[in-house]
Amino acid sequence: MTYAVQLPSEGPDDWAAWSRDLAARIRSLDDGEDVTITVPELARPHQVRKARAFGLIPARYEDVEPWVRVRRDEHHAVVEMVGSEDFGGLFFFTEPEDAALEALGWRRPGPISMEERVWNRWYPDDVTDTAYLPKDDALAAADLVTRTLRDILYSAQR
């Protein structure tokens, strides 16, 4: 089951409370379930067709809204975010935004061409022999999502 969350154009009134609620939701996921957060108001154009015939047929663009998904994969929470056009994803991030995402701990997809072209991060980061997601890892995953939305995507709007 997917839990869909659509954030308002200005973001939550209380980011800390929203992050705590997200951590609780993450810990309650059953295997294979996910929570997906979208922000339609922060959509950016993505080129889906280049100009052709010497510009007589113009390039075509579609708006792509940013999304972040946290899904449970056995004993891990896999956090994924719409990929940057820089590595073949669908969302236009500026170079400073790409650098900020890496600084937050997001990982670019590997060199395997079949791999989905999204930013990702696993919690816990290593093989685990514990039950699904300790509270600290759920809080860390929620914090990554919160800081990404608040400090990178929403701050670009201002």
Protein language model annotation of sequence segments:
Residues 1-158:
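Structured alpha/beta or helical-core interaction and ligand-binding surfaces enriched in interleaved
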